Amino acid sequence: MNKLNILIRFDDICPTMDYSQFKKATDLLDKYNVHPLIGVIPECQDEELLIEEYHSDFWNYIKELEKKGYKIAMHGFNHVYDTKTRGNINCGFKSEFAGHSFIKQYEKIKKGKEILESHNVYTDVFFAPSHSYDDNTLRALSKCGFKYISDGYSKKIIRRYGIKCVPCRTTGVPKIKNKGNYTAVFHAHEWVRSDKAHAYNELENLLKKYSNSIKDFDIFVDQPQGNYAIQNIIEKVTVFYLRYIKSKLSYVKHNVLKP
Protein backbone atom coordinates (compact mmCIF):
# COMPACT_ATOMS: atom_id res chain seq x y z
CA MET A 1 0.00 0.00 0.00
CA ASN A 2 1.13 3.54 -0.71
CA LYS A 3 1.48 6.19 1.97
CA LEU A 4 -1.64 7.91 0.64
CA ASN A 5 -4.74 5.88 -0.18
CA ILE A 6 -8.18 7.26 -1.01
CA LEU A 7 -11.52 5.50 -1.41
CA ILE A 8 -14.41 7.14 -3.27
CA ARG A 9 -17.85 6.24 -1.93
CA PHE A 10 -21.31 7.05 -3.31
CA ASP A 11 -24.40 6.65 -1.12
CA ASP A 12 -28.13 6.35 -1.86
CA ILE A 13 -28.07 4.34 -5.07
CA CYS A 14 -31.59 3.08 -5.79
CA PRO A 15 -34.08 2.60 -8.68
CA THR A 16 -35.68 6.02 -8.11
CA MET A 17 -32.52 8.11 -7.73
CA ASP A 18 -31.59 11.13 -9.85
CA TYR A 19 -29.96 9.34 -12.77
CA SER A 20 -28.81 12.51 -14.52
CA GLN A 21 -26.77 13.57 -11.51
CA PHE A 22 -25.32 10.12 -10.99
CA LYS A 23 -24.37 9.99 -14.68
CA LYS A 24 -22.37 13.17 -14.15
CA ALA A 25 -20.50 11.25 -11.48
CA THR A 26 -19.94 8.10 -13.54
CA ASP A 27 -18.75 10.14 -16.53
CA LEU A 28 -16.09 11.74 -14.34
CA LEU A 29 -15.14 8.47 -12.70
CA ASP A 30 -14.82 6.75 -16.07
CA LYS A 31 -12.65 9.58 -17.38
CA TYR A 32 -10.10 8.90 -14.63
CA ASN A 33 -10.67 5.12 -14.57
CA VAL A 34 -11.75 5.24 -10.92
CA HIS A 35 -13.98 2.56 -9.43
CA PRO A 36 -15.93 3.71 -6.37
CA LEU A 37 -17.73 1.88 -3.62
CA ILE A 38 -21.46 2.40 -4.22
CA GLY A 39 -24.13 1.87 -1.59
CA VAL A 40 -27.26 0.24 -3.02
CA ILE A 41 -30.48 0.42 -1.01
CA PRO A 42 -32.28 -2.94 -1.38
CA GLU A 43 -35.84 -1.66 -0.93
CA CYS A 44 -35.82 2.13 -0.82
CA GLN A 45 -38.81 3.74 0.89
CA ASP A 46 -37.19 7.07 1.72
CA GLU A 47 -39.45 9.74 0.21
CA GLU A 48 -36.50 12.07 -0.34
CA LEU A 49 -34.99 9.51 -2.70
CA LEU A 50 -38.17 8.95 -4.72
CA ILE A 51 -36.90 11.39 -7.32
CA GLU A 52 -37.59 9.63 -10.62
CA GLU A 53 -40.01 6.94 -11.68
CA TYR A 54 -38.87 3.42 -10.85
CA HIS A 55 -36.29 2.29 -13.41
CA SER A 56 -37.05 -1.32 -14.30
CA ASP A 57 -33.52 -1.79 -15.66
CA PHE A 58 -31.90 -0.67 -12.40
CA TRP A 59 -30.51 -4.04 -11.38
CA ASN A 60 -29.05 -4.68 -14.81
CA TYR A 61 -27.47 -1.23 -14.55
CA ILE A 62 -25.89 -2.18 -11.22
CA LYS A 63 -24.48 -5.36 -12.74
CA GLU A 64 -22.96 -3.32 -15.57
CA LEU A 65 -21.32 -0.99 -13.06
CA GLU A 66 -20.00 -4.01 -11.22
CA LYS A 67 -18.48 -5.35 -14.44
CA LYS A 68 -16.69 -2.01 -14.86
CA GLY A 69 -15.05 -2.48 -11.47
CA TYR A 70 -17.44 -0.63 -9.16
CA LYS A 71 -17.71 -2.28 -5.74
CA ILE A 72 -21.27 -2.83 -4.53
CA ALA A 73 -22.21 -2.37 -0.88
CA MET A 74 -25.57 -2.79 0.81
CA HIS A 75 -26.67 0.61 2.10
CA GLY A 76 -29.20 -0.12 4.83
CA PHE A 77 -32.47 -1.85 4.00
CA ASN A 78 -35.16 0.74 3.19
CA HIS A 79 -33.33 3.94 4.24
CA VAL A 80 -36.14 4.95 6.60
CA TYR A 81 -35.21 6.26 10.05
CA ASP A 82 -37.46 4.55 12.57
CA THR A 83 -35.60 5.10 15.85
CA LYS A 84 -34.39 8.22 17.61
CA THR A 85 -31.09 6.70 18.63
CA ARG A 86 -27.59 7.98 18.00
CA GLY A 87 -25.76 4.72 17.59
CA ASN A 88 -22.05 4.22 18.15
CA ILE A 89 -20.58 7.17 16.28
CA ASN A 90 -23.09 9.55 14.72
CA CYS A 91 -24.28 12.84 16.21
CA GLY A 92 -27.90 12.91 15.10
CA PHE A 93 -30.72 11.15 16.93
CA LYS A 94 -32.07 9.13 14.02
CA SER A 95 -31.35 5.67 12.72
CA GLU A 96 -32.62 2.79 10.64
CA PHE A 97 -30.71 0.32 12.80
CA ALA A 98 -29.30 1.66 16.08
CA GLY A 99 -31.65 1.11 18.99
CA HIS A 100 -33.38 -1.90 17.47
CA SER A 101 -32.94 -5.36 18.96
CA PHE A 102 -30.47 -7.80 17.47
CA ILE A 103 -33.34 -9.87 16.03
CA LYS A 104 -34.96 -6.83 14.37
CA GLN A 105 -31.68 -5.75 12.83
CA TYR A 106 -30.83 -9.28 11.74
CA GLU A 107 -34.18 -9.55 9.97
CA LYS A 108 -33.65 -6.25 8.13
CA ILE A 109 -30.14 -7.12 7.04
CA LYS A 110 -31.03 -10.66 6.05
CA LYS A 111 -33.99 -9.48 3.97
CA GLY A 112 -31.91 -6.76 2.32
CA LYS A 113 -29.23 -9.25 1.37
CA GLU A 114 -31.86 -11.63 -0.02
CA ILE A 115 -33.25 -8.84 -2.21
CA LEU A 116 -29.81 -8.05 -3.61
CA GLU A 117 -29.08 -11.70 -4.26
CA SER A 118 -32.44 -12.18 -5.98
CA HIS A 119 -31.04 -9.76 -8.57
CA ASN A 120 -27.68 -11.59 -8.68
CA VAL A 121 -25.95 -8.86 -6.69
CA TYR A 122 -23.64 -10.34 -4.07
CA THR A 123 -21.68 -8.34 -1.53
CA ASP A 124 -20.05 -8.62 1.87
CA VAL A 125 -19.80 -4.84 2.38
CA PHE A 126 -22.33 -2.71 4.27
CA PHE A 127 -22.84 0.82 5.48
CA ALA A 128 -25.82 2.30 7.30
CA PRO A 129 -27.77 5.47 6.50
CA SER A 130 -26.40 8.51 8.37
CA HIS A 131 -23.48 6.43 9.69
CA SER A 132 -25.85 5.20 12.41
CA TYR A 133 -25.31 1.68 13.71
CA ASP A 134 -24.60 -0.04 17.01
CA ASP A 135 -23.08 -3.28 18.29
CA ASN A 136 -26.23 -5.22 17.39
CA THR A 137 -25.80 -4.07 13.80
CA LEU A 138 -22.28 -5.47 13.69
CA ARG A 139 -23.39 -8.74 15.26
CA ALA A 140 -26.25 -9.07 12.78
CA LEU A 141 -23.95 -8.28 9.85
CA SER A 142 -21.55 -10.98 10.98
CA LYS A 143 -24.35 -13.54 11.24
CA CYS A 144 -25.53 -12.63 7.73
CA GLY A 145 -22.10 -13.23 6.24
CA PHE A 146 -20.89 -9.65 5.82
CA LYS A 147 -17.18 -8.92 6.30
CA TYR A 148 -16.87 -5.13 6.08
CA ILE A 149 -18.59 -1.96 7.18
CA SER A 150 -17.49 1.34 5.64
CA ASP A 151 -17.67 3.41 8.79
CA GLY A 152 -16.02 4.41 12.03
CA TYR A 153 -13.70 7.10 13.37
CA SER A 154 -10.61 5.00 13.93
CA LYS A 155 -7.65 5.85 11.70
CA LYS A 156 -6.92 2.26 10.79
CA ILE A 157 -9.07 -0.79 10.12
CA ILE A 158 -10.17 -2.64 13.22
CA ARG A 159 -12.32 -5.71 13.71
CA ARG A 160 -15.48 -5.77 15.83
CA TYR A 161 -17.72 -8.82 16.16
CA GLY A 162 -15.94 -10.33 13.16
CA ILE A 163 -16.60 -7.26 10.99
CA LYS A 164 -13.73 -5.19 9.61
CA CYS A 165 -14.56 -1.54 10.28
CA VAL A 166 -13.06 0.48 7.42
CA PRO A 167 -12.76 4.08 8.68
CA CYS A 168 -14.97 6.75 7.15
CA ARG A 169 -14.11 9.81 9.20
CA THR A 170 -16.14 12.48 7.36
CA THR A 171 -19.54 12.87 5.73
CA GLY A 172 -17.98 14.51 2.66
CA VAL A 173 -14.47 15.11 1.34
CA PRO A 174 -11.80 14.96 4.05
CA LYS A 175 -8.81 17.26 4.27
CA ILE A 176 -6.17 15.11 2.62
CA LYS A 177 -2.55 15.22 3.76
CA ASN A 178 0.46 13.59 2.13
CA LYS A 179 -0.17 10.25 3.80
CA GLY A 180 -2.97 8.29 5.41
CA ASN A 181 -6.14 6.47 4.40
CA TYR A 182 -9.18 8.56 3.50
CA THR A 183 -12.76 7.86 2.43
CA ALA A 184 -14.52 10.62 0.46
CA VAL A 185 -18.32 10.36 0.53
CA PHE A 186 -20.68 11.73 -2.13
CA HIS A 187 -24.47 11.96 -2.62
CA ALA A 188 -24.98 12.75 -6.30
CA HIS A 189 -28.70 13.50 -5.98
CA GLU A 190 -27.88 16.45 -3.71
CA TRP A 191 -25.89 18.26 -6.39
CA VAL A 192 -29.04 20.00 -7.66
CA ARG A 193 -29.16 21.94 -4.38
CA SER A 194 -27.36 25.28 -4.30
CA ASP A 195 -25.75 24.44 -0.96
CA LYS A 196 -24.48 21.08 -2.23
CA ALA A 197 -23.57 21.82 -5.86
CA HIS A 198 -19.95 22.39 -4.86
CA ALA A 199 -19.59 18.67 -4.12
CA TYR A 200 -19.39 17.91 -7.84
CA ASN A 201 -16.43 20.26 -8.13
CA GLU A 202 -14.89 18.61 -5.09
CA LEU A 203 -15.14 15.24 -6.83
CA GLU A 204 -13.60 16.63 -10.00
CA ASN A 205 -10.74 18.27 -8.11
CA LEU A 206 -10.15 15.10 -6.10
CA LEU A 207 -9.90 13.02 -9.27
CA LYS A 208 -7.61 15.53 -10.98
CA LYS A 209 -5.21 15.87 -8.05
CA TYR A 210 -5.19 12.40 -6.54
CA SER A 211 -6.20 9.93 -9.26
CA ASN A 212 -3.03 7.89 -8.71
CA SER A 213 -3.81 7.54 -5.00
CA ILE A 214 -7.47 6.53 -5.39
CA LYS A 215 -7.89 2.81 -4.87
CA ASP A 216 -10.52 0.19 -5.60
CA PHE A 217 -12.17 -1.07 -2.43
CA ASP A 218 -10.45 -4.47 -2.44
CA ILE A 219 -7.04 -2.79 -2.64
CA PHE A 220 -7.95 -0.07 -0.15
CA VAL A 221 -8.83 -2.60 2.55
CA ASP A 222 -5.66 -4.63 1.95
CA GLN A 223 -3.82 -2.85 4.74
CA PRO A 224 -2.60 -3.90 8.20
CA GLN A 225 -5.20 -3.66 10.94
CA GLY A 226 -4.59 -1.16 13.69
CA ASN A 227 -4.09 -1.87 17.36
CA TYR A 228 -7.64 -2.25 18.66
CA ALA A 229 -7.10 -0.50 22.00
CA ILE A 230 -5.41 2.51 20.41
CA GLN A 231 -7.87 2.82 17.54
CA ASN A 232 -10.83 2.43 19.88
CA ILE A 233 -9.55 5.35 21.97
CA ILE A 234 -9.08 7.46 18.82
CA GLU A 235 -12.67 6.74 17.80
CA LYS A 236 -14.14 7.51 21.22
CA VAL A 237 -12.21 10.78 21.51
CA THR A 238 -13.32 11.81 18.01
CA VAL A 239 -16.96 11.00 18.73
CA PHE A 240 -16.82 12.96 22.01
CA TYR A 241 -15.33 15.96 20.20
CA LEU A 242 -17.94 15.91 17.43
CA ARG A 243 -20.86 15.48 19.82
CA TYR A 244 -19.94 17.81 22.65
CA ILE A 245 -17.05 20.12 21.74
CA LYS A 246 -17.25 21.06 18.07
CA SER A 247 -20.63 22.82 18.26
CA LYS A 248 -19.53 24.83 21.30
CA LEU A 249 -16.34 25.95 19.58
CA SER A 250 -18.36 26.97 16.54
CA TYR A 251 -20.72 28.99 18.74
CA VAL A 252 -17.81 30.81 20.37
CA LYS A 253 -16.22 31.51 17.00
CA HIS A 254 -19.36 32.96 15.41
CA ASN A 255 -20.98 34.64 18.41
CA VAL A 256 -18.27 35.56 20.90
CA LEU A 257 -15.17 36.13 18.80
CA LYS A 258 -16.87 37.59 15.72
CA PRO A 259 -15.56 41.03 14.64
Report the location of each language-model feature.
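A general structural detector for well-ordered alpha-helical segments in enzyme core domains, enriched
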Residues: 21-25, 57-62, 108, 112-115, ...
